[in-house]
Amino acid sequence: CVMQFAQTKDYILVRHTQDTILASYLNDMSKYNNLNEIKKTRLAYDNITVQLSKKNTRFQYKLIKKGGRASEFENAIEWLCLSGIVSQVYKVEQIKKPLENYRDIDAFKIYVSDLGLLCAKKDLTADDVLYETPEINDFKGGMAENYVNVQLSINGYRTYYWQSERGAEIDFVIQRDGKLI
């Protein structure tokens, strides 16, 4: 889509392509998923923007469905991760090496792998994203975090986050050249 826009400067054509990709995501959820997991996967996928709009972006199953629990949606989340549509960023209890050893498997955030598709999914325009738009300002913080996660991930970093008991948070913790950042 980026190349298409660079060549054509046509937002409508790009949005059509994005809509086609989003439709293929939904088709893949039906085609390559267990029958009893299709609805759960779609519910989880549709709920990602709700999760990103929350001040506390830690993933909450109860936001997918009232009374939702990990046991009900963990396969759906795993399918979305394995398909490359989303990524999980785990909370670490301590910022020590190796980070993987200190992750809390029950506390994580979910980010999408393509922000352009996220905007298309929610029918957001470039102006919505670039300029102050009170209707979506809560969502912009989650989008900014999502953007940082994508950039770190495409540069080969495994991302984690840390949160204190009182709520202070470091949005991203990575290991670079043997150092924790």
Model-based region annotation:
Residues 1-3:
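The conserved phosphate-sensing helix
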Residues 5-180:
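Accessory nucleic acid-recognition modules appended to NTPase machines
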